[in-house]
Regions:
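Sec-dependent signal peptide recognition
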Residues: 2-10
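Extracellular beta-rich ligand/substrate-recognition surface
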Residues: 22-25
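N-terminal helix-cap/turn-to-beta initiation motif at the start of protein domains
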Residues: 27-42
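Exposed boundary/loop context
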Residues: 9-11, 34, 59
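Central antiparallel beta-sheet cores of small beta-barrel/beta-sandwich binding domains
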Residues: 46, 50-120
Length: 120
């Protein structure tokens, strides 16, 4: 019995690693992801910068205030870094299709283009 347990547990652990949700898997929820709904209001996020080897060089918290007027999504991002420095970036996003967006912000060269996919 112990021998079977020693074989079965590692096999189940390995099998479970391959069954993680994917962004392409629309079956995780019945609600389609809506960028404008998600960011309309207050959101807090946490992040970090790291190099190619995974070494963290800087951490931050960002408070995001979003407002949606029916065609434009405005995001005011207030960053606070772990060293106490602060930065603000204001994004203006325009919905170009059912899941397409184009955005711009001061300090960003060119336009950002993106697509939404998946569920909430």
């Amino acid at each position: 019995m112990l021998k079977l347990f020693k074989i079965l547990v590692p096999v189940l652990l390995i099998a479970s690693c391959g069954m993680k949700p994917s962004i392409e898997d629309d079956k995780l929820s019945d609600r389609k992801f809506s960028l404008e709904e998600f960011f309309d209001g207050e959101t807090t996020a946490y992040g970090q910068f790291q190099d190619i080897l995974g070494n963290v060089s800087r951490r931050f918290t960002v408070d995001i205030t979003g407002s949606w007027d029916g065609s434009n999504l405005r995001l005011i991002e207030d960053f606070v870094y772990e060293d106490g420095s602060e930065e603000q970036r204001i994004w203006n996003l325009v919905k170009t299709s059912d899941n397409g967006w184009i955005g711009s912000a001061d300090g960003v060269i060119g336009k950002a283009e993106g697509l939404t996919s998946g569920d909430m």
